[in-house]
C-alpha cells in the first residue's frame, strides 16, 4: 500500500488470530488502506470476516465461494467488497449482491479458477457490469498492465509477481528458483 497499490493480506488457511496479528502488523507499517483476501471455503472464513470489521480493514477480496452471506456485515462497516470472478455470470451476480468492484481472473492466475484467458475475460466482464473491473492472471509487467487497461480494466492484480519479494515468507530456495527461471 505504501507504494501506491492496494496491499492485500492473504488470510489463506491461517487461524483467525494470526490474521488479526497480520492486520495489526500492517497497520504499524502503513497509514494507507489495505485489504484482506478471504478464501470463503476455509472453515475460518466467518471468523476472519468478522475480524476484518473489528480491525477496521478497508477492503476485502474473496475467492473460493460466494461472499453473499457476509455482504451486509461488510457493507454496514464501510468495507469495500471485491470478489474474484471467472465468468460474466459470476460478475453480474456479484454486482447484484452489492460488490463494489470485481476482479476478473483469467486461467493464467495462480488461483486458476476458470478456463477463459484474462485478456478474453476482461472485456466481456467490463461490458457486462457497471462497477469497476480489475484484471488478474498472467500480468507481470507494464505491458500486461497496459493491455488490461486497453481492454477496459480500471486496475490490475498481481500475486505471483511478488513471490520473490523480501516481504514474501516463501523459502529462499524457492525465491532463487523463481528469479533464475527463463520461461
Predicted regions mapped to residue ranges:
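Active-site entrance/lid segments in N-terminal catalytic domains of soluble metabolic enzymes
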Residues: 1-132
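Conserved active-site-proximal phosphate/metal-binding subdomains
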Residues: 120-134, 140-183
Amino acid at each position: 500500500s505504501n507504494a501506491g497499490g492496494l496491499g492485500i493480506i492473504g488470510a489463506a488457511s491461517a487461524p483467525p488470530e494470526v490474521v488479526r496479528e497480520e492486520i495489526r502488523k500492517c497497520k504499524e507499517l502503513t497509514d494507507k488502506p489495505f485489504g484482506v483476501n478471504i478464501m470463503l471455503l476455509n472453515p475460518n472464513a466467518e471468523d476472519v470476516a468478522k475480524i476484518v470489521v473489528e480491525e477496521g480493514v478497508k477492503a476485502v477480496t474473496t475467492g473460493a465461494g460466494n461472499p453473499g452471506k457476509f455482504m451486509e456485515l461488510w457493507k454496514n462497516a464501510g468495507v469495500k467488497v471485491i470478489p474474484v470472478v471467472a465468468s460474466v455470470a459470476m460478475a453480474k451476480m456479484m454486482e447484484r449482491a452489492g460488490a463494489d468492484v470485481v476482479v476478473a481472473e483469467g486461467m493464467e492466475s495462480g488461483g486458476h479458477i476458470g478456463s477463459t484467458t484474462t485478456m478474453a475475460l476482461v472485456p466481456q466482464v467490463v461490458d457486462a457490469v457497471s462497477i469497476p473491473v480489475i484484471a488478474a492472471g498472467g500480468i507481470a509487467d507494464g505491458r500486461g498492465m497496459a493491455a488490461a487497461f486497453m481492454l477496459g480494466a480500471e486496475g490490475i492484480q498481481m500475486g505471483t509477481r511478488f513471490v520473490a519479494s523480501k516481504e514474501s515468507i516463501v523459502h529462499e530456495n524457492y525465491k532463487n528458483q523463481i528469479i533464475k527461471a527463463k520461461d
